[in-house]
């Protein structure tokens, strides 16, 4: 896996291509991140790079956390993320990771927490059809039959029912990078990204089976 970067979703907008077509895009403040730890095969059993993003207040961190973070500099970082790599000799603790690790035209995978919608019913959560709304019907938004019969005499696990909707990790794959502004740490990708504006997202090179390409070191 190539190293990625952490960022903050700013919101959605649109750009116009050379033919005048409106292209929906998501604006992300990507980095800057800092390398906080290098993991090696002899010491940790695998090779990885840990990065940190966002500034945290001193009171929100424990002494062990502050001791770990201060090795990479004087900035106390809020969010940590680890990326497994084949070798990490080109990195050092404290090195800054910026949006320049990506390039226009590259495809990326972006992970984040989806917007939480609370306890939701069948129609909203799963898109079920509703029942009749008139002529004395009492089955407007009810689920209908949920089980079989005497056999098996129970509801199978995994049955789609009402429940908590959203607030889960979602990964959107193959998003195209359409613009980069390294002065503002801005990454613009085509399409939508999980989460609400202000939420933390993880951006990494598109993971294609058999393809070892990715972001530049």
From Swiss-Prot:
GO terms for biological process: translation. SUPFAM superfamilies: Translation proteins. Pfam families: Ribosomal_L3. Residues 142-153 have a biased composition (Low complexity). The keyword Ribonucleoprotein applies. InterPro entries: Ribosomal_uL3, Ribosomal_uL3_bac/org-type, Ribosomal_uL3_CS, Transl_B-barrel_sf. The keyword Nucleotide-binding does not apply. Residues 129-161 are annotated as: Disordered. One of its GO terms (molecular function) is rRNA binding. Keywords: Ribonucleoprotein, Ribosomal protein, RNA-binding, rRNA-binding. GO terms for cellular component: cytosolic large ribosomal subunit. It comes from the Bacteria. Belongs to the universal ribosomal protein uL3 family. One of the primary rRNA binding proteins, it binds directly near the 3'-end of the 23S rRNA, where it nucleates assembly of the 50S subunit. Part of the 50S ribosomal subunit. Forms a cluster with proteins L14 and L19. NCBIfam families: L3_bact. This is Large ribosomal subunit protein uL3. The lineage of its organism: Bacteria, Bacillati, Cyanobacteriota, Cyanophyceae, Synechococcales.
